[in-house]
Amino acid sequence: MANSPSAKKRAKQAEKRRSHNASLRSMVRTYIKNVVKAIDAKDAEKAQAAYVLAVPVIDRMADKGIIHKNKAARHKGRLNGHIKALNLAAAA
């Protein structure tokens, strides 16, 4: 338990930051989930539209340090790969 006033303030700030960051992480997961749902439904246009909306959010959270930049790159790469495979399957 924090005893000094500065430690109490830091604990309060950390708790506020933790809850805010949790909200932002949840938002990223929701955007990713929307892309995955469209991919699972084999809807290439909807998947591409959801991906275009998700990329700036993923990048912004990586810039803020909410998620690691490599994790952001991994998500974007894998989602884009699935969309490309979906488009190839539709074209074939």
UniProtKB/Swiss-Prot annotation:
GO cellular component assignments: cytosol; small ribosomal subunit
Keyword presence, Ribonucleoprotein: yes
The keyword Coiled coil is assigned to this record: no
An annotated Gene Ontology molecular function: small ribosomal subunit rRNA binding
Record's keyword terms, sorted: Ribonucleoprotein, Ribosomal protein, RNA-binding, rRNA-binding
Annotated spans, Disordered: 1-23
GO biological process, one term: translation
Ranges of compositional bias, category Basic residues: 7-20
Superkingdom of this protein's organism: Bacteria
Family annotation (InterPro entries): Ribosomal_bS20, Ribosomal_bS20_sf
Function: Binds directly to 16S ribosomal RNA.
Family: Belongs to the bacterial ribosomal protein bS20 family.
NCBIfam families named in the record: S20
Protein's name according to its UniProt entry: Small ribosomal subunit protein bS20
Origin species: Pseudomonas fluorescens (strain ATCC BAA-477 / NRRL B-23932 / Pf-5)
